[in-house]
Amino acid sequence: MKILVLHGPNLNRLGKREPAVYGSLTLEEINAQILNFTQERGIRVEFFQSNHEGDLVDQLQAAAESMDAVVFNPGAFTHYSIALRDAVASIDIPVIEVHLSNIHAREEFRHKSVIAPVAAGQISGFGSASYLLGIQAALSLAQSRRN
């Protein structure tokens, strides 16, 4: 099983950017948690982070050819990126949208996700555990598709 963990804009600033909202872990520390979790389960994982919408679209499209699922934190693109929405809708593998913070308990403009309607599901508000829960969901969906 191969999963792409895709990190969107500003996630490279984790640990420095608003730790009261996003926690004190860096992106590297979160990736290490994910790697430990996936290696224990025999899951291969690749990581990619970009602040650029087109790079994320490219990764989603490529994942359709080489991955079993995607765990995707689109960051602020969650709320308005039709390009990312269309990229998620265009691929035939499960995409789980994840967020460190609970986007539904934050500012009004963060409540709407344009990605969620085309994703397999959304996990929000569990800090770095959102990624681990997303991987579990992605794994379950990908395995059920194989059967």
Swiss-Prot record:
Record key words, sorted: Amino-acid biosynthesis, Aromatic amino acid biosynthesis, Lyase
Xref: Pfam families: DHquinase_II
E.C. numbers: 4.2.1.10
Xref: InterPro entries: DHquinase_II (IPR001874), DHquinase_II_CS (IPR018509), DHquinase_II_sf (IPR036441)
Record-annotated site: Transition state stabilizer: R17
One function term, GO molecular function aspect: 3-dehydroquinate dehydratase activity
Binding site for substrate: N73, H79, D86, L100, S101, R110
Protein name per the record: 3-dehydroquinate dehydratase
